[in-house]
Amino acid sequence: MTAHRIPLSDLEQGIPFEQRHIGPDSEARAKMLAQVGYGSLDELTATAVPDVIKNAEALELPGARTEAEVLAELRSLADRNQVLGSMIGLGYYGTFTPPVILRNVMENPAWYTAYTPYQPEISQGRLEALLNFQTVVAELTGLPTSGASLLDEGTAAAEAMALSRRMGKNKKGLFLVDADALPQTIAVIETRAEPTGVEVVVADLSEGIPAGIAEREINGVLIQYPGASGAVRDIKPLVEQAHELGAVVTVAADLLALTLLTSPGELGADIAVGTTQRFGVPMGFGGPHAGYMAVREKFARSLPGRLVGVSVDADGHKAYRLALQTREQHIRREKATSNICTAQVLLAVMAGMYAVYHGPDGLRTIARRTHRYATILAEGLKAGGVEVVHGAYFDTLTARVPGRAAEIVAAAREGGVNLHLVDADLVSISCDETTTRAQLGAVWTAFGVEGDIEALDAAAEDTLPAALLRTDDYLTHPVFHQYRSETAMLRYLRRLSDRDYALDRGMIPLGSCTMKLNATTEMEPVTWPEFGQLHPFAPAEQAQGYLTLIRELEERLAEVTGYDKVSLQPNAGSQGELAGLLAVRGYHRANGDEQRTVCLIPSSAHGTNAASAVMAGMKVVVVKTADDGEIDVEDLRAKIEQYRDELSVLMITYPSTHGVFEEHVADICAQVHEAGGQVYVDGANLNALVGLAKPGHFGGDVSHLNLHKTFCIPHGGGGPGVGPVGVRAHLAPYLPNHPLQPEAGPATGVGPISAAPWGSAGILPISWSYVRLMGGEGLKRATQVAVLSANYIAKRLEPHYPVLYTGPGGLVAHECIIDLRPLTKATGVSVDDIAKRLIDYGFHAPTMSFPVAGTLMIEPTESEDLGELDRFCEAMIAIRAEVEKVGSGEWPAEDNPLRNAPHTAAALGGEWEHAYSREEAVFPAGVSAADKYWPPVRRIDQAFGDRNLVCSCPPLDAYDD
């Protein structure tokens, strides 16, 4: 018998999840607190966080649950979702995710825990995968340049509208939209157009541009191909007519259909947009999925989002990188026409690998089978006396059944199949990769007809017009032909992931990015079919599990932030910003204050802030930042007075982008409110606030959150993300809504921000699980440890590198900025040199030169244990000693391990003529040969890649370098 008998209830609990999520245990935290000079976490945060913003009470959240309990709760929610056969279509289709891709990409932390490939030398695997994706999109659309993903089809179409505005000839003209476009796409375009003054006209374009519209100035035209109704028509005459009128032409195209149909590029399109969801990505109740955009060459340098290109490294070997980054919002700020940054990399990788796995022949077979099912279904309906509206279609047909549509849709539902109710007389039916013979039979039964599949198969003919059949070859690169066996595919995926650095390998201390644990328990339910295979427009009664989860997550996020209402629709932080600013705009306009259009933004703000403000129809006015990193209060006061009658909103990040808790934040908010403005608190740094302070209580009217930062959704190598927007009650009537799901938002809302009603709903179980696993106290402790870890690093590095900004008590928030400018001035060693040298030490670099050029911003998060924090600190201290050797002349300025970093395994072979040893190059202080990370390439020549733009798969020999 033991001296102390543990109660059964304690034994049943096991180790709390909090101890799995938070890296430093109690003993380690005591050591860290001693280093920082505090006796407890409460004492530390009592000093760091200004009194005026502190929570008066604990978070009112359900208590923490064990991992087993949370999985059981999620299983109960999942069981309340009914997964019927989906034949709704409208841009979302059933698809089979090849298990080798599901297990080795979607469920693999080597892929889903990576960050955006800003450090290309340690991102070669996913950059190659994204190049595959770009090649698939470019070749299927017949356009030379494709981006590395957008957020969804609706936002891609809206981005095409903005690109047309920027690049088109008739810049003040209207934007004409095909009435047969997807309804959610039309709605997103209208939401995005209104604030910027773009007139959108929706018209039937089946017979060309109507005369009354053709007489007007047209900036751009968007055509759906095939149409939402299923119609396949020759759009070339329409494209030619639009071009004659000086318009830019965008075609929203189905990639699977393009394996059989003439490409948009060949038909004359300038831009092609769409979604790659049906290339192996589960529907997920609306997302996440990778949208796409491909463009003609003259538009390439204005393409929104990320673009992967081919360059060379220091040895002249082929290497991949993000190209033309000066296009992006973090560079262009208020001059940007898009706020897209992180998009949908993980899903783009999956879609690209789907094409690699199936190859062009496999994709054609899937497309032909899908089309055959549609033709058999149509012939059976026609034989039973049902009118099929269009004679040419790919996968979708529309049936006319006067007065019977609702009855038929209900009968099909009873038979286990969801159809799309168009109106009282029309029913739309879509086939896909997962369609079965039994589903065809269920549809016929619902219509009251019978069909013999074998007989109809023998008689049915393809309906695609001969003139539109694709004749050119595509996906001819060897990568789309050499991985047919699962063994080969498995090894290809492993080779690529081994080239990358992700959280499964080590800490990623990127400031303002919050690269914390994405726990397996949180991730596991995402691929359950009850969550993954539900169509976003399925009837609400079939999605009760999802709707309950969504409501609970919204309520819990509202409690955490102090807001009254939260919308989960925005599928990225950038879209959350836009949604929040549109809510502010809607509020002012409802009050008759249309003149309130000025948005005040500190000079240190995230680049998306300014870009989003412009997209919301606002005028950006920059507020100075003081020498201590805080907002220049005097300049702010002056700007408030100058624009008092025009002031719409102040956008601030809290804690600030300089990594400190600003003491005057409540006073700043009060000044803006007194002048009639609203306060937008950017939630990028919420990981320093949860459980300690609530933006909605210290003056914020609206915030977006980043569930892919604070609430554990993985970054996926550059997406997916979720950017919910939280608002005070007076702004709630102006949150996003959706035309196809009334439950998704208020009737008075600004319209949809995303194509799907609840955005990337498929990954919301991750954040729901995190909050449930941690409980209110656990969330608070996670925040406190995040603050402790940042201060621990700051204290350890301060003797070697100046910490640029501190707040109350000389403390930082959850991140710290170290100033390398004095070192660079004295030695010539740049911030880039130190970032690349960290690779040799086995680390991803911190954030470079943001928000201050020549600095590193370090955010360790609460998930890294003391051993990893110390390993990073020791690497930085060792690098500081290396910089001294350069400064003293012991190592030449142009030939030292910093200037030549990173070093590859290939560098060890052959002659060695450097002023430092091989060991100093690849096994610097503290680096073990046993678990060394070897970068696959040396430093990449960024300028070469932009001068020689190549954005699709290079010749095969490049893969062997």
UniProtKB/Swiss-Prot annotation:
Modified residues (N6-(pyridoxal phosphate)lysine): K709
Keywords noted in UniProt: Oxidoreductase, Pyridoxal phosphate
Keyword Cytoplasm: no
E.C. designation(s): 1.4.4.2
Presence of keyword Methyltransferase: no
Catalytic activity, reaction form: N(6)-[(R)-lipoyl]-L-lysyl-[glycine-cleavage complex H protein] + glycine + H(+) = N(6)-[(R)-S(8)-aminomethyldihydrolipoyl]-L-lysyl-[glycine-cleavage complex H protein] + CO2
Pfam families: GcvP2_C, GDC-P
Any one GO biological process: glycine decarboxylation via glycine cleavage system
MF (Gene Ontology): glycine binding; glycine dehydrogenase (decarboxylating) activity; pyridoxal phosphate binding
Enzyme class at the top of the EC tree: oxidoreductase
Cofactor: pyridoxal 5'-phosphate
PANTHER family with a match to the protein in the record: GLYCINE DEHYDROGENASE (DECARBOXYLATING), MITOCHONDRIAL, GLYCINE DEHYDROGENASE, DECARBOXYLATING
Cited function: The glycine cleavage system catalyzes the degradation of glycine. The P protein binds the alpha-amino group of glycine through its pyridoxal phosphate cofactor; CO(2) is released and the remaining methylamine moiety is then transferred to the lipoamide cofactor of the H protein.
Subunit comment: The glycine cleavage system is composed of four proteins: P, T, L and H.
Name of the featured protein: Glycine dehydrogenase (decarboxylating)
Originating organism: Streptomyces avermitilis (strain ATCC 31267 / DSM 46492 / JCM 5070 / NBRC 14893 / NCIMB 12804 / NRRL 8165 / MA-4680)
Gene: gcvP
